[in-house]
């Protein structure tokens, strides 16, 4: 009888452990309620006249979601070239930047980013630049991106280590807007 009880307790604890959601998985899940919605953003740090962002309407769209990949186009004015791609594998989240041209072809600088070095938190993931990024854009080798998401807001942030380069844009997730924008690619 004692062995049966121990076996049952072991089975319950294994089932409970499997049922727990990792921080990285919870981060990916946080996008799900926003699928198909658009949100307006504002630059909260690093914006300056002539940077291509300041003074433009900033929109994000959670265009697609599944448990392993989330695509979030980032529209800057009429420029529909940018999509943030979050991928989940081996309990880590990866961020890649997909850049396309207006004719639907890939930009020569695309798919840069990095993978979180740990499972992060349910509301924040950090992405140091990976080797692929360094090969593609040598000056971006010291980039660190971090993204936050909670019930009220989404932020995309970039810091270039060793410089004063900081860029942050924040989106209000409590106020979805109507848009028919779609990325160029």
Regions picked out by a protein language model, each given a short descriptive name:
Residues 1-21:
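Bacterial Sec-dependent N-terminal signal peptides
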Residues 22-49:
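Tryptophan-anchored aromatic micro-motifs
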Residues 34-40, 65-73, 93-94, 151-155:
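Short, hydrophobic/aromatic-rich segments at coil-to-beta transitions
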Residues 40-67:
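Short, solvent-exposed loop/hinge segments that bridge or flank secondary-structure elements
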Residues 63-100:
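Mid-chain, structured segments of secreted extracytoplasmic proteins
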Residues 85-132:
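An exposed acidic His-Trp-rich patch
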Residues 110-115, 151-185:
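Edge beta-strand at a domain terminus
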Residues 121-149:
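Acidic, glycine-rich flexible loop segments
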């Amino acid at each position: 009888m004692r062995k049966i009880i121990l076996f049952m307790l072991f089975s319950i604890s294994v089932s409970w452990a499997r049922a727990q959601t990792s921080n990285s998985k919870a981060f990916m899940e946080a996008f799900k309620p926003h699928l198909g919605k658009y949100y307006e953003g504002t630059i909260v740090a690093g914006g300056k006249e002539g940077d291509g962002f300041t003074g433009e309407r900033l929109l994000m769209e959670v265009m697609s979601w599944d448990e392993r990949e989330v695509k979030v186009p980032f529209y800057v004015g009429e420029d529909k070239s940018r999509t943030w791609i979050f991928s989940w594998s081996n309990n880590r989240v990866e961020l890649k930047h997909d850049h396309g041209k207006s004719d639907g072809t890939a930009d020569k600088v695309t798919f840069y980013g990095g993978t979180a070095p740990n499972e992060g938190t349910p509301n924040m993931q950090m992405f140091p630049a990976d080797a692929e990024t360094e090969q593609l854009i040598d000056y971006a080798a010291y980039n660190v991106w971090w993204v936050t998401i909670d019930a009220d807001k989404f932020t995309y942030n970039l810091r270039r280590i060793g410089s004063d380069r900081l860029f942050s844009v924040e989106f209000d997730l409590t106020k979805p807007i109507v848009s028919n924008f779609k990325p160029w690619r």
